[in-house]
Amino acid sequence: MGLQEDFEEYAEKVKTLPESTSNEDKLILYGLYKQATVGDVNTSRPGIFAQRDRAKWDAWKAVEGKSKEEAMSDYITKVKQLQEEAAALKAVFRAYLVGEMNIFECHIGRLTRCRRGFRTQMKKQIVYSPGTREMNLLSLIKPSLAHVGYCSTYG
């Protein structure tokens, strides 16, 4: 694939970056994208009351003078870097949940593997890991439905 095709592919991949991506990184990507697609800044700086537009304009202005090819290459590199950081953070978070907090995976609609410990472990999971997407689902499960699920520990 050529640089243009790679750039278009990574312009789509950027949409899958986590919401926790910093505004600074988003602005860097914005500036590189604009430089790669439009070229040098061709508008005047937005007024002081348009802070968001002003920050975006400043990010674009910061990469002024780069060739379109260089901006595309830098954009691809930055997206790869952010994807790697997100994957590493996810792995660390998962290892923490599994190792430190003894979190287990719970699937609804299958036969029980650990009938005796299910309710106790499920309660521990809800207490230890509030706020995760999985817990939002598990918090809706009534203890009387424990027999339709199974639990298994990671590791």
UniProtKB/Swiss-Prot annotation:
It holds the Pfam family ACBP. Residues 3-88 form the ACB domain. InterPro entries: Acyl-CoA-binding_prot_CS, Acyl-CoA-binding_protein, Acyl-CoA-binding_sf, FERM/acyl-CoA-bd_prot_sf. CDD domains: ACBP. Induction: Down-regulated by cold stress, wounding and infection with the rice blast fungus Magnaporthe oryzae. Belongs to the ACBP family. This is Acyl-CoA-binding domain-containing protein 3.
